[in-house]
Design a protein with these regions (language model features):
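Feature detects amphipathic, helix-rich regulatory segments
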Residues: 1-157
Length: 157
């Protein structure tokens, strides 16, 4: 997870988008300086391009694929899984969309802790099969998005 950013370290405009749990997967409404970003990125864990970021608070399980752009994420509310080459990120994104996280059902304030993630068993087919599954669902998501856009266009006629 990224290092905590305090409100006084952000501004409404600036160099580096800062995503909080409410803006994660959307448009940033806060920014941090390039200097702070460079310092924190060099000192603290930071995702790699292609990593799947996951919301651990609020709308638990919302995922975003990290594009590699210069942007920063709210401390323990947005996390990612560092893993080896036995797990494909596109497959992991599909898995995150269907997993039932143990230990969070019924709690008043929903929160996904490291133990919830680390103790979750992931059935892992071969990497080649994971890639096929991940690619299939990514293409399916793209087709659904295109059809939704077409529906919006048709409704606006």
């Amino acid at each position: 997870m990224c290092r905590r950013i305090f409100k006084e370290q952000t501004s409404e405009s600036g160099d580096i988008p800062f995503y909080k749990i409410g803006t994660f997967g959307g448009q940033a409404d806060a920014y941090i300086s390039s200097e702070l970003f460079a310092e924190y990125r060099s000192k603290y864990p930071y995702p790699k391009e292609g990593d799947i970021l996951i919301s651990a608070s609020g709308s638990i399980g919302r995922t975003v694929e990290f594009t590699g752009n210069n942007e920063y994420f709210q401390d323990s509310n947005i996390v990612w899984l560092n893993h080896d080459d036995r797990l494909d990120n596109a497959f992991l994104k599909c898995f995150y969309s269907v997993v039932k996280w143990a230990g969070i059902e019924g709690s008043t304030i929903k929160r996904l802790y490291n133990d919830n993630i680390l103790n979750t068993v992931i059935s892992m087919p071969s990497v080649a099969e994971q890639k096929k599954i991940g690619t299939f669902f990514k293409e399916l998501d793209n087709i659904i998005t295109l059809h939704q856009r077409n529906c919006i266009c048709l409704l606006s006629l």
